[in-house]
């Protein structure tokens, strides 16, 4: 994608503030118009009550905030960020997530965290890519929201197979005991930040780790939730 500084990544119109990356019109257009469960983030009847799935088998987190489904126009930007090394996209995407978080806080009283957590990459994958996209989303969020963030708060204990090609059952098995907590979280309100949540296996494994170590609450914030 050819880009010009000061123009919106999506519509190519001039930006009021060049560092925003995505204009206000496109920012509003990217938000899903579907009613989503506030806990699992999947389509539901009500946006303020847990869905039937969560009532029967709740995920190991209390709240999920997402901007949109994993579909255009956001999916191509996320793909470029991760696989074309366009790390400059991250700040614009992080701002979209911030706007969604602030909207949830205004409308539902969403609790802001004490600390946000990146989803870690295995060392070799991090080296090959040159960055962790979750870190690039967390860094501006922590600054804007005045909360703590440490890229090494959770680390990977081993390499795992690429999740994209695995079933939900194999994803869960693939990630079993794949993470280690490096910082105390007792009594803290935590948020896990990721770019895309599909089955939720990765964030579920990290959420369980945080809760086992005494975290008061765990939320998941992501750019896209596969709906």
Swiss-Prot record:
It comes from the Bacteria. CDD domains: PRTases_typeI. Pfam families: Pribosyltran. Could be involved in gluconate metabolism. Gene3D superfamilies: 3.40.50.2020. InterPro entries: ComF/GntX_DNA_util-trans, Competence_ComF, PRibTrfase_dom, PRTase-like. NCBIfam families: comF, PRK11595.1. Belongs to the ComF/GntX family. This is DNA utilization protein YhgH.
